[in-house]
């Protein structure tokens, strides 16, 4: 991070592409206005929001996934009219005027889109807020070429909500919808019991379904190996399918969102002439559908 040995009082003139001082608009919550709110706190998503008066909202979000992730969006009441180069600077708070400003990075905000920052830079913004500083976005006003816009995030009342946000991230599920949307599970060689690994996978699916109100369809298809005759295989397959229907209903899913089908020993995916092939054929395929928002 490069340090600019300047105070916040002269930031606007030095950020200008011209050699002369420019007028600027600055959007920031006063200490009395500053709010941070956890608007989503579930095992699937965490969202921390900071309203910026007369401008919009600063939104940090993280979602259930194999990897820890963080997105930052600067949601604007009025979208960008033109694409602009943006300087992201860490500014001292008003009560520490003698401190220097630190350049964090340069970005682009694109026409008709909210501002977006991801990855390490988004984590860096949180880090600056935790230090009590004001991360500030500065760019040329697309409506007035001789004017710059400054949008700052206030660190007032940030820490307690940030602690809650950090706790939420730590408790996110370690898999996403895409990881479980199509799953093949396998049964033990005798009876209706899933293998140990399959039981663990089914429990993961259950955790996701419990916390996601957008799951609107569960498709279950069960298959057997060729050990039994056609009638016995079909009966076993249907029994397994109905058992899973009951399981998903116990999670709170309406009956009309669950479709199950037993196929018996039809549609093998491996050679039933070997134990390994039979193990692969004794399976259930679970597909999830959800409403996209």
Swiss-Prot record:
SUPFAM superfamilies: OmpA-like. Coiled coil: none annotated. It is found in: Cell membrane. InterPro entries: Bact_OuterMem_StrucFunc (IPR050330), MotY_N (IPR041544), OmpA-like (IPR006665), OMPA-like_CS (IPR006690), OmpA-like_sf (IPR036737). Keywords: Cell membrane, Flagellar rotation, Membrane, Signal. Transmembrane segments: none annotated. It comes from the Bacteria. GO terms for biological process: archaeal or bacterial-type flagellum-dependent cell motility. Pfam families: MotY_N (PF18393), OmpA (PF00691). GO terms for cellular component: cell outer membrane; plasma membrane. Residues 175-292 form the OmpA-like domain. It is a peripheral membrane protein. Residues 1-21 form the signal peptide. PROSITE patterns: OMPA_1, OMPA_2. May play the role of a stator in the sodium flagellar motor, stabilizing the force-generating unit through direct interaction with the cell wall. This is Sodium-type flagellar protein MotY.
